[in-house]
Each structure stands twice: as structure tokens, then as C-alpha cells.
Amino acid sequence: MTSAHTNVTIMIAEDDEGHAELIMEQLRSAGVSNEIIHFRDGQELWDYLMGAGQRTSRHDAHGFLLLLDIVMPRLDGLEVLQRIKADKQWHNLPIIMLTTTDDPREIEKCRTLGCNCYITKPMEYERFTEMLKRLGLSLLVVQTPKIQPQNGQGGKLT
């Protein structure tokens, strides 16, 4: 990824340590140099997002991308997805469901709840990392300057 993409932190919520290691290894071997944070279950991720975990949260969806497994202990991916999309600080967080579940009803449920993409494991990692690069780029491009009014006349870009 280019230096512009290094501002995006990739969060992986995956309870299977082997799957998580494989995902991280494949991302690194494809040249992804972004910070990657691994969460072992949905509750650990949710605690991080809410600032209650052991790590420090930035409390802002900008600059993050979430790879989310569905079947996890304590708090499953569907519940995490639903909570994130209902949260005013995190609802814009890009979420890619990355799971072994290929049931069309599950896929539709994830899309209805607001996931940005649904990928079934195992997957072709070159295509996956290319998609991440495109999504990361679009995250940076989508950010627009805020217009602040000046004494009731027009606005000023900030």
C-alpha cells in the first residue's frame, strides 16, 4: 500500500488463531504495511471500540477497516455488526465480513445490517488485498472538507 494508505488501521476480529495468523501473514506478504490489530472475539473488539478494553481506542471510525468473522465466542459477528451500525461514533466504519459461512440467508442478513463486503473463506488473497487497497483508497478519497459559514456569508473550506 502507498503511504497514503498507511493511515488506515486494519482490525481483525477472528477467534481462530490459525485463521487470524494466515490473514495477517497474507496481508504482509502482499505488501500491506498498515497497522493490524487482532481481536480474539467480538466482546474484545466491542470493548476496544467503546474504550473499555486494555488498548486505547481512538473513538472514531475514520482511519479504520474491520475484517469481521461471524461465529465467535462471547459476542458473535452479527451482534457486533448490528451494534457498530447503531453506534453514532462508529456507524461509518467499513466492515468486511470474512467467514466460512456461505449460507445465502447469512450473507443477506449481513448486507441488511450494513456490512460493506462479504467474503467467504478460504479465499484468493491477491484479490482480497487488491480489494482492500481499493477500499482504503476510497476511504481516503471519500473524506470531504467541512464548510464553515463565515458571518452568514458563504462558507470557508477547512
Regions found by a protein language model. Give the residues of each.
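Non-catalytic signal-transmission and effector/linker regions of two-component phosphorelay proteins
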Residues: M1-M11, E17-I37, Q43-W46, M50, ...
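Receiver (REC) domain active-site loop signature in two-component systems and cognate sites
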Residues: I70-P73
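Short, glycine/charged-rich "phosphate-handling" switch motifs in NTP-dependent
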Residues: N116
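A Lys-centered signature of the CheY-like receiver
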Residues: K121
